[in-house]
Amino acid sequence: IQRFYLLSCTFILKKRKTKVVVAMNEGKEKEEEQAQGRQELWDSLPDGAVYHAPTNPDDFFTGITFDISPRQFGLRVRKNDMYCELGGPRHRYSSFFFIEVVKEGERIEDGRVEVIGPEIKEIEGQSLPFGFWIRYYGKGLTEDYLDLLTRWTYFALEEGEGWMLLNTRDTIWLRLHKKYAHKHHFKHLGQAMINLCKIQFPLVEKADAKILIAREDLGGAARTKELIDKVCIPYCERVDERARTFTDEDVDTFYGCTICQTFAPSHVCVVAPDRPPYCGIITWIGAKVMCDMDPYGYIFEIPLDECVDPWGGEYAGVNEKVHEKSNRTYKRVVMYSSITYPQTNCGCFEAAIFYIPEVDGLGLVDRRYSGETPLKMTFSKLAGLISGGQQNHGYCGISFRTPRSRKFVRADGGWHRVVWMPAEYKQMLAEFIPSDVHDKIATEEDCVDASALKEFLKRVDHPVVALWRNGEEPEPLRIPTPNTDWDSEEEKVAREKGRKLKRA
């Protein structure tokens, strides 16, 4: 019997090991297939003007005449001061900034920068969709360093004289100030991006870039959207999926980021496995790598210490570090809430959560949506209202990835508290919305006015109706003004409402 048991266990273990190996091989095959597809798309792009950037470190910035320094960080360029605009809302955020780690060095011609389309001097006063595709290779370079590579590549724009950069990935938005336009060329921008990364990160051995300025004769926004769908999204989803294998319970350290304090002086972003940062640039894995590489930089460790509230995600260590790094402005952060002590808001968020008092529910809105919300304001107006480093109870910036989290606004009732969102955003997140509430969340196609939203929620029997008096009249929370504390009794009411939806 013992011999049979041992043989059975050995067979089961071998079978499991075989399954793991098969899964790994299938994942590797899929990754290689995607890499080949990306190379084919790279090669299929129209020919452009080729510039060979210096590859000798002594000459990395030869020819570049614009300043690159921290004092340039956080510039905002108003419409009247704009020389040109790339991406952004005029093109429904159909532009991209794509960073790729290439495994085969022979695919890259080091220092090659190809500008497909017009140069900067040819597009004064214009607004065009665009795509920056940057590739890096190094023997020790893996996708674990992707967030680090992305951040350092962005510095050519974020710290580049005259540039305004907002958002990331496929929602990127650039403007160039007319005062500094004479200093700039796209070829030198590509040179700055790849060589800044080489200086900061010696593992990078080779790099090249393609800059697509998508005029109509080059396919316009349709061309950049095709590249987003075929290149950016599959690559980023695979990387994000790996990041989601961790949960907050798996780690004893979160990470903080203060890079946005150049324009939001009291803002502190807390990066956790289940709570990606608003900007969408980094993950918990990326923050860990960046902190290990530069322990004295703007990314820092946050030891969790005692868990004050497991359901809401409040930790003594997070509160202490946020208080210290926010110039002692804020004392509490509840990680899984947008209503009670949410994280502060900078201005880089890809989407936002907002409280709708007329129905005692939450709404979502993303940058791509240009219409009004039930608050009777657009995303841009809402963003202007809640940004700047304030703690706005009931209003919180998020990244596109945040609603995919298992702990998305869990303390507020999770998805069962969400009552409205744009149709396109809802479709994007469909697989992450619980089936019992999906059809009960209104979009602009159903209603926008708060009174009409109230009737819609009653008609579909949305879970939030359980919070209303007799299921008929909402009892809105008395939310405190920004940067102030909750009344202790009202905070209890807010927390109990979240728990009630949890039990439901």
Residue ranges and their predicted role:
Residues 12:
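Extended, histidine- and acidic-residue-enriched regions that form the cofactor-binding/catalytic faces
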Residues 25-26:
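PRPP-associated nucleotide enzymes
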Residues 31-503:
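Cysteine-centered metal-binding/redox modules
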